[in-house]
Every structure is written in C-alpha cells, then in structure tokens.
C-alpha cells in the first residue's frame, strides 16, 4: 500500500465508476497535475480552488446565466488577481528558505532545515538532488567538483582493492572525442607520463580491447599510473560534456574536425585536476582552481542557452551542467524505517524542494490560505473594470471560491471556517492570519507560515482554466460499456456415473 499526503498522487489514483463523473474528475486532476509540473507543489490547493469555482459557477448557470460571459468574468478576474499577487510578493531571505520548505513538507522543520542547508552550500541556483538512503536517518552531502555517472572501464585500474576505487591526486586528463582503436596512437602521451611521473586519466568515446589491454598491462607492471573511462552522455550531449571537462581542467579535446589527431598529441593538450576519484559507477573530477575565469565564461554561456531553451528537460540538463562546472551538487539522502514510509517521505521532501526553488524564482507571500483570502478582498475593485453584469457575477464566483482553501484548513484543524475568515479579514495587516498548527491568530510571516508566490499563482491560473472548460461544456462524449455476456451454464453431466 502507498500511504501519502500528496495531493497530485492521490488525485492520479482516483477513478470513478460512472464514465461521465470520471471525466469531471480527470478535469480537476489536470489542474493539480499542471500546477505540480510548473511549481512542484500546491496541488491540493488547485483542486480545492477548482472545486470552489465549479460549484459556485454551476449554481448561477443553473439559474439561467450565460456561461460564456461568466467564464470571461472568471478569466479576467484571475488575470487581474495575478498582477495583485505580484504586488503582495516579496523576495525570499536566506533565513526564510527553511520555513518555506518546512511548511510544504507538512511543518517538518528537520526537512526544512536540511533543504535550506543544501541551498546555502551550493547556492540558490545550485543543483539539489534526492536519493533513497540506506539508513533511517536523513543525510546531506555535497559532491565537490564535477561528478558524472561513468565508472572505470576495467576493474584492473583500481588503486584501492578494498573499496574498489581509483584515486589520483594532481592527475592529468586526456580527452578524446572518438573511439581509441590502436594503442600505438597513445605512445607519445604515455611515454611523457612515465617520464613526468604523473598519473593520467583517459576519457574517450570508447576504447577497443587491444588498446585497453596495453593500458592494463602497463598499470599492473607499475610503470604507469593510469585509468580510463567512457565519456559521459551520448551524441551532442557527450561532446558538450567533454568541452565542459576541458574547460574545468584546462585541457583540449582531441577531435578530427579541428585537425587534432591522437598520434600527434603531447602533454600540451592534457588537462589538470587536483584530484580524481573513480568507482565502478561514477567519476568525480575536482579542478585545481586555475581555470576559474574560463569556467565563469562557460557558465554565462550556458545560462544564455537556458533562457533560449523551451523544454523543461533541456533546462534541467543545462542547469546540471552549470552546477557541475561551478563546483558542487548537494545530495539529500532520504531515510526511513520502512519502504512505505520512505516513499511518503520522499514525496514530501520533493514537494519541499520544489517549493523552495519556486520561492527563489518568484518570491514569497503569506501562507495558510490567507493570501487567497486577501485577494478576495481585491475583487470588488476589479468588478468595476468588467463590461457587463454577468462578467461581474463571474468575478463574484472567484471571490467566493478564494475563501474555500482557508475554510478547509480551518475545518481540518477542527474550527469553524466562516468564523476564521471573518476574524482574519477584520485585521487590515495582510501578514495577519490563522496559524492552524498552533490555533493562534498572528503575523504569519514572523511565524514562518509562508507560501511561494509561484505556487499560489499557478493554483489560481490552473483552477480558473479548468473551471472555464467545465462551465462552458454542454455535453460529454463517453464510451458505452459493453454489457458483459452471461457466463455459460455447465453442460449436463451425462457420464452415467452414480446411476
């Protein structure tokens, strides 16, 4: 069984028996999924808001209102409220990152502090990844330097046979953007390595058996400290990775296109690393800091590519490259006692991490459903800008729906939602709200009850979009289930047994 407290995971599993009802459920599920894709959190709020807009909208349409004008009113109001939301937003301070993460993880400050610490170590734009840990405790470690998932080609290269790792300090790197087929091509480089007494790491597209055998024999004889790995990535991405490694280590990639061949290569094309550590699955290269200027230029170049990239996957990969170059990826290992707890905990940490990234991007607002309630108070001013009375009814629907999340939070905390709403609105300070964890009315910013602006914005936009589709739909087309054929009766027993 999967025990979760994550809106989108629950919504994905909801399948209703009635096919018409199921289409409605799928629509609302879309609001949660879209918010999850963009902001990574706020899925439950999207569902509650969408339900509020639909429930209020159906009432007025049933009474004879024009659904097209109503949804126009909803759309225009949502757009205007997004602009109001941006005015209410403030930039997130480093001290508030832990609060954002903790609120998203269900008031778990252990997770909140760990994410804040990870961000402080690798920077706000740094890469933080999640892993399933092997113990019951959560752990955080930072991978210094550039790490990628490629291990040594042959176990004969290991220097520590207990740990099965290869470690070299002040190591030279030979970068080759093609397959090494012939050991003779390497003679120049290897002879210079023996003379200079320095270890060498070869990174190539692949190394054929004959060339590899030569390297292994030299390593086992002890005449050469050497190791070889396949270049990370495939196709175009492999070429980019090799260029990144070259910039980090100050080396040159050997490519036929630029007129550099392996047999002519000497120690001038080699890069230098302060340390390299290789295991069966991964390689870590720590630069010696001498190429800082080139690295900074390369990072700026990749940032321009991120702005031009359209797909999220592409952006993610480019961000990873920046983190590897700029030195450091933080890894959070999520620990738990059981498999079920681990899955649930990992989802929470993921939500918290996404919420923190969203807060860094677009800033923060007061949490606990109070920001949506404050936006409801701004609807009256927006009504005056709308064209006709039916659009104003659409705006009124938004105003009512914006109270739903806070009322539900209050109800879940065991208090009357309407009373809480009145009490919060009676105070003009927009930071003032209801803290469901303690049952107090207080300054929520100071209490650390904070939501990322991006999450609240996505909730509002996607709930309005789903409600518009729902309210303007007239008919539903579904498949008719085939009636199941009645099972055949058992044929009469005519074996004659028992007569």
Swiss-Prot record:
GO cellular component: chloroplast
A single BP term in Gene Ontology: protein refolding
UniProt keyword annotations, A-Z: ATP-binding, Chaperone, Chloroplast, Nucleotide-binding, Plastid
Gene3D superfamilies membership: GroEL (3.50.7.10), GroEL-like equatorial domain (1.10.560.10), TCP-1-like chaperonin intermediate domain (3.30.260.10)
GO molecular function ontology, one term from the record: ATP-dependent protein folding chaperone
SS bonds (residue pairs): none
Zinc-finger found in the keyword field: no
Subcellular location: Plastid, Chloroplast
Described purpose of this protein according to its UniProt entry: This protein binds RuBisCO small and large subunits and is implicated in the assembly of the enzyme oligomer.
PANTHER family xrefs: 60 KDA HEAT SHOCK PROTEIN, MITOCHONDRIAL
Family membership: Belongs to the chaperonin (HSP60) family.
Other notes: This protein shows ATPase activity.
The protein's assembly and partners: Oligomer of probably six alpha and six beta subunits.
Protein name: RuBisCO large subunit-binding protein subunit beta, chloroplastic
The organism of origin for this protein: Secale cereale (Rye)
Underlying gene: CPN60
């Amino acid at each position: 069984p999967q025990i979760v407290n994550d809106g989108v995971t629950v919504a994905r599993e909801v399948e209703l028996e009635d096919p018409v009802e199921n289409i409605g459920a799928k629509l609302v599920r879309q609001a949660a999924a879209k918010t999850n894709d963009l902001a990574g959190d706020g899925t439950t709020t999207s569902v509650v808001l969408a339900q509020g807009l639909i429930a209020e909208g159906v009432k007025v349409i049933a009474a004879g209102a024009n659904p097209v004008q109503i949804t126009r009113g909803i759309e225009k109001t949502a757009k205007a409220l997004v602009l109001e939301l941006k005015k209410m937003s403030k930039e997130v301070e480093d001290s508030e990152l832990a609060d954002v993460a903790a609120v998203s993880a269900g008031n778990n400050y252990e997770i909140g502090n760990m994410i804040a610490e990870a961000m402080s170590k690798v920077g706000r734009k740094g890469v933080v990844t999640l892993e399933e840990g092997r113990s019951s405790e959560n752990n955080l470690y930072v991978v210094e330097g550039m790490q990628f998932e490629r291990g040594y080609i042959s176990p004969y290269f290991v220097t520590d046979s207990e740990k099965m790792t290869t470690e070299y300090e002040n190591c030279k790197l030979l970068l080759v953007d093609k397959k090494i087929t012939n050991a003779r091509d390497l003679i120049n480089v290897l002879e210079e390595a023996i003379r200079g007494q320095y270890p060498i790491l070869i990174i190539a597209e692949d190394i054929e058996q004959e060339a590899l055998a030569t390297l292994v024999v030299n390593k086992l004889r002890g005449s050469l400290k050497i190791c070889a790995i396949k270049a990370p990535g495939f196709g175009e991405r492999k070429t980019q990775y090799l260029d990144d490694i070259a910039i980090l280590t100050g080396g040159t990639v050997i490519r036929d296109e630029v007129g550099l061949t392996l047999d002519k290569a000497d120690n001038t094309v080699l890069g230098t690393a302060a340390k390299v550590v290789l295991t069966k699955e991964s390689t870590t290269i720590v630069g010696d800091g001498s190429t800082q200027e080139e690295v900074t230029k390369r990072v700026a170049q990749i940032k321009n590519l991120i702005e031009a990239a359209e797909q999220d996957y592409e952006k993610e990969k480019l961000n990873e490259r920046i983190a590897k170059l700029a030195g450091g990826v933080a890894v959070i290992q999520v620990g738990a006692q059981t498999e079920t707890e681990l899955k649930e905990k990992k989802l929470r940490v993921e939500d918290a991490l996404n919420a923190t990234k969203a807060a860094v991007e677009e800033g923060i607002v007061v949490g606990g459903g109070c920001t949506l309630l404050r936006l409801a108070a701004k609807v009256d001013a927006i009504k005056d800008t709308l064209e006709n009375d039916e659009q104003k009814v659409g705006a009124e629907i938004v105003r009512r729906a914006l109270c739903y999340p806070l009322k539900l939070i209050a109800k879940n905390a065991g208090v009357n939602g309407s009373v809480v709403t009145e009490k919060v609105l009676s105070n003009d300070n927009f930071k003032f709200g209801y803290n469901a964890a303690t049952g107090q009315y207080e300054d929520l910013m100071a209490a650390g009850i904070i939501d990322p602006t991006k999450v609240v914005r996505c909730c509002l936009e996607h709930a309005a979009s789903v409600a518009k589709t729902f309210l303007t739909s007239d008919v539903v087309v579904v498949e008719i289930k085939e009636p199941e054929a009645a099972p055949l009766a058992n044929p009469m027993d005519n074996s004659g047994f028992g007569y």
